Amino acid sequence: MAMTDPLGDMLTRIRNGAARRKSSVSTPASKLRARVLDVLQAEGYIRGYSEVEFGNGKAELNIELKYYEGASVIREIARVSKPGRRVYVSVKSIPQVANGLGITILSTPKGVMADHQAREQNVGGELLCSVF
């Protein structure tokens, strides 16, 4: 059976791995997932990720989770726009997460970026997820 929400699956793997204090989790590779992980790494929510290619043409992303004093840096990670209900926002209506302490990740015409970058570049888009 085909996966209906690959990004939601990746976020769930990160959430479950952090809850079980795993050092890393893996997920099937895609360009969108890699761009979201780029934003998470730039914002300091994960240590990094690497792409592992298999001989059959498939690839996986190994995500290194980040912890501070034994607790996960990611307290909450949630999908906002889902396959059954897409959420689009203009630059004026980009929400703040946890009063500015968290981030929202958007898919914009200029690429996948964090909410503060979208405000700087004056661009809206699809709200992919929120992280705190």
From Swiss-Prot:
Stored PROSITE patterns: RIBOSOMAL_S8
Gene Ontology terms for molecular function: rRNA binding; structural constituent of ribosome
Keyword Amino-acid biosynthesis: no
Domain of life of the organism encoding this protein: Bacteria
Keyword Iron in annotation: no
Keywords: Ribonucleoprotein, Ribosomal protein, RNA-binding, rRNA-binding
GO biological process: translation
InterPro entries: Ribosomal_uS8, Ribosomal_uS8_CS, Ribosomal_uS8_sf
Any single Gene Ontology cellular-component annotation: ribonucleoprotein complex
Record's subunit section: Part of the 30S ribosomal subunit. Contacts proteins S5 and S12.
Protein function: One of the primary rRNA binding proteins, it binds directly to 16S rRNA central domain where it helps coordinate assembly of the platform of the 30S subunit.
Family stated for the protein in its record: Belongs to the universal ribosomal protein uS8 family.
Descriptive protein name: Small ribosomal subunit protein uS8
Source organism: Sinorhizobium fredii (strain NBRC 101917 / NGR234)
